[in-house]
A protein has these predicted regions:
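Membrane-embedded alpha-helical bundles of multi-pass transporters/translocases
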Residues: 2-362
Length: 362
């Protein structure tokens, strides 16, 4: 056992425990990416321009809080370590605010907008408070780089599993739990997600351990750290690239439900083994997003080999271009070309899915 600890070999149970943290997080992140616009315009009922501004403001604010939270977490000292405690301390507030975010209050428009700004920015702050330390935990879970790579792979598998769960089940679940009341369905769905998230975060907290101690270095202030970041050109380039990528993912995902609801509508489709059936926009959207998640997972597997041969930067640029073109081409298709729409989704997701992996690896 001492030899195992010395070389940093982790049990499979601990590797799985870490992955549960991303399973919890992506239930929310994938919802924001796929259904943000639809929820706020068609369920919450605020103007699209207000919803778009809300998203933009929160993204800019999030870029600031991410940096600050990283500095705070790095200075945290507890008996549980630097990073694990945040999973314990904030999982319940995160779940509660998640329910409030997807609650539609009986307010006038101004009151609704205030509610939306407060709750959405608060859920994003809590997301940052949990996920910045959670991501950093990967670096201290083992001194063995091969073990950390394995844990990272499991983390991405859990993330894509959560993406598939959201894509396949969220819209049907809101219908089922709402009993005809769409707003109530969203609120109850996030009660379910919230309970699941608490359990998953606690599994990640309980099942992992911080083993790599940070070296004692000269203490610096947050102000000094920020000054060094601002003058760091590679960091600035990576930040702009990350913002561009997130905006692409957000726009691509957020218009999907509206596209199927108002452009595609209900379709009669002939499928092998299922015959000819009629599908409404909820089923088509869920199928479209699920196909995208599976394609993204396959893309992540493929890019791990391609990046070694052609380079991470080259593959990122190539895949980003293909993803953008595949997404743009959908505009030129009609509702009757549903098969081609799904094929472009496969191409766009196969190349778009691995972008986050390549981005973090550069």
């Amino acid at each position: 056992m001492s030899k195992q600890k010395e070389i940093g070999i982790l049990s499979f149970k601990e590797k799985l425990s870490y992955g549960f943290g991303d399973l919890a997080s992506v239930l929310y992140w994938q919802t924001f990416m796929l259904y943000f616009t639809f929820f706020y315009t068609d369920v919450f009922i605020i103007p699209a321009a207000v919803a778009a501004t809300l998203f933009l403001v929160s993204r800019i604010f999030d870029g600031i809080t991410d940096t600050i939270m990283g500095m705070i977490a790095d200075r945290t000292q507890t008996r549980w370590g630097k990073f694990r405690p945040y999973l314990l301390w904030f999982c319940v507030p995160f779940a509660i605010v998640g329910v409030l975010t997807f609650t539609v209050p009986d307010f006038e428009l101004t009151g609704k907008i205030i509610w939306a700004y407060v709750t959405f920015n608060l859920i994003m702050i809590l997301y940052t408070i949990i996920n910045i330390p959670y991501t950093a935990l990967l670096g201290v879970i083992s001194p063995n780089s091969a073990e950390r790579t394995t844990v990272s792979s499991i983390k991405f598998i859990f993330a894509f599993a959560a993406g598939i769960i959201v894509s396949a089940t969220l819209l049907p679940m809101t219908q089922s739990l709402g009993g005809g009341n769409e707003a109530l369905g969203w609120q109850r769905s996030f009660m379910v997600y919230g309970i699941a998230a608490i359990v998953f975060f606690l599994i990640a907290f309980k099942g992992t351990k911080e083993r790599v101690l940070s070296p004692k270095t000269q203490k610096t202030s947050i102000k000094q750290d920020l000054k060094e970041l601002v003058t760091n050109k590679p960091w600035g380039i990576l930040l702009l690239t990350t913002i561009t990528f997130i905006l692409f993912v957000a726009v691509r995902g957020s218009v999907t439900v509206h596209y199927f609801k108002y452009i595609i509508g209900t379709q009669s489709i002939q499928l092998p083994f299922f015959g000819n059936n009629t599908y409404d926009f909820n089923i088509l959207t869920s199928a479209y997003n699920t196909v995208g998640q599976i394609s993204s997972l396959l893309g992540v597997v493929a890019v791990s080999f391609l990046a070694k041969k052609f380079g991470k930067q080259r593959m990122f640029i190539l895949f980003f271009i293909i993803a953008i073109v595949s997404t743009a081409l959908v505009k030129f298709l009609t509702a009757q070309q549903i098969g081609l729409i799904f094929i472009l989704q496969i191409f766009g997701s196969f190349t778009g899915g691995p972008l986050s992996v390549l981005l973090w690896a550069m």
